[in-house]
């Protein structure tokens, strides 16, 4: 858990976690990276959040124990989440609204495109956002009135018995959930069996 403090009343909070063992490694990694934020001008960070991301994952020594994967990546997530949380608080908006109100240029600058330019470039993203600017207010109004679907993972964790998977699915259906997430990565046969159990329990019309 990271708390990013400023010389004002604002502070940002970010978290990361493992499934149990290893949280102390995340803490150690955050402590190793915190020098990159101490005494920084926060407005300089928010001018180009994509460049900020690139800077904190590019430490010439910490790259030897990363880069951008494993415990270093988990620590980076906590720090970056704290930065975004602080940014939203400074602007006096919930984070979703901060993002919605960004200009296309600001939004594109918040992304590090270096690993995805074979699929989309900054210019491509900018053009997509600019084309859709005219419908932004309408889409925001729809979200505010209708909400946005969320999913539950309560039944989808690895290691649950078949009976527990089924009962948790049915409980979630009774609570109104319509989207279900299933963890995969064990034996493929087990994943297929678990998916079948979940599908039978949630029915054909809900998303898995």
Predicted segments, located by residue:
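N-terminal capping/lid subdomain adjacent to the active-site entrance of alpha/beta enzymes
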Residues: 1-207
